Amino acid sequence: MYEPSRQISSFYIAGFQYWDGALVLSELKVGERLRLVPEFDNPHDSSAMAIYRGKTKMGFVPGSENELLALMFFYGHSDGFELRVLQVSPDKNPWEQVRVGLYVTDAR
């Protein structure tokens, strides 16, 4: 069966409470695509992968999930992945308000 993409991971956005995600929380829709941006010069984690909605930085891919993804981006394979909103829970603690899914896309 053909699938245009396959989910390989899901997680809450790390550091959501420290960035500007709250500014766009009410606008987020399940299924909406978000943008992954590597931060290879990040002083805390050279594998850091920031998550953006438009120009709004929402937080990061958790450190436990970012190393292989950052490596793929470093070697030019960024087109093979997409990040989508899976759950928006405004009433939860900030670190559990937005859960996203990481998908590998079919390039065949």
Predicted regions and their residues:
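Conserved active-site motif detector
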Residues: 1-108
